[in-house]
Amino acid sequence: MTSRIFSLTAMIAISCLGAFATPSVMAKEKNPSDRQSDQLRQLTVLSYHEVTQNKNSLIPNYAVTATQFKSHLDWLTKNGYQFVSVDQVLEAKSGLKKLAPKSVLLTFDDGYASFYETVFPILEQRQIPALLSIVGAWLEPTTQQKVKFGDESVSRNQMLSWTQLQQMQKSGLVEIGSHSYDLHHGILGNPQGNTQPAATTRLYDRSTRTYESDRDYAQRIQRDLVKNNQLFKQHGLKAPRAMVWPYGR
C-alpha cells in the first residue's frame, strides 16, 4: 500500500528518488527539465495510513500511534528535514522555486476519521502541511449506512465526514487528494483466478477468455478519476491536484 504521487494535470510522478541522484563525471550543462528532476530527487515522501490510539484499528499492520507519529516528526525536525506542501512540490516541478535539500512531504491515505481526531491537531499545533488522499466510494454512504471496506463492512463514522474535509482544506495545511473513487480493491487478473489491484490491472473476462484492452482500461480509470473529481466539487471541495494510486509502488 505504499503510494506514488501524481499531479492530475500532468500525471508527473513525485517520488522519493534521492538515493539514485548520482551526477555524471562527464555531465554537460543541464537543461531546465533536468534541474527540475534533480529538485524532486531531493524530496522524501513519507506515506501513512492510520494514526490512532485505538487498538482495533481498521488496518493494524499499517497503523501507528500518535506517540509514534510525534516521535517521527521530532526526529525529522532534529535531523534538519523541512516539511513541504504540495504547492511547494508543484512549484519546484515547474521550476518556479527550489526545494530545500532535505524536504519531506507527509502523505496520508484512505480518509480515516482518526486523521481528523489525531493527526490534524498535531499538524495544526506544529504548522506542518500534509497531503490527505481519500477514496470517494468510502465516503458516499450516509451515517446510518455501512462502508464496504475490503471484505468487511465498517461504520461510516470510522471515515472522515465531508464537513471535516472542508474544514481541513480551508486551514491551508491539508491538501485533499484523490485516492480514486472505487479502485481500492482487487479484480480478476488472469485465468488462474488471481486477484490484482484494480487500478493497475487489465481485467480478465472468464466468459470470453480475454483481457481488457488498453483502451478499455484507460477509459475505466478515467471514468473513476472523473467521478471522484465530481464528488469533490459536489461536497464543496476543490478539485484534487494530486492522485495517489491505490497499491501503487
Residues of each region from the PLM?
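Bacterial N-terminal signal peptides that target proteins for export
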Residues: 1-10
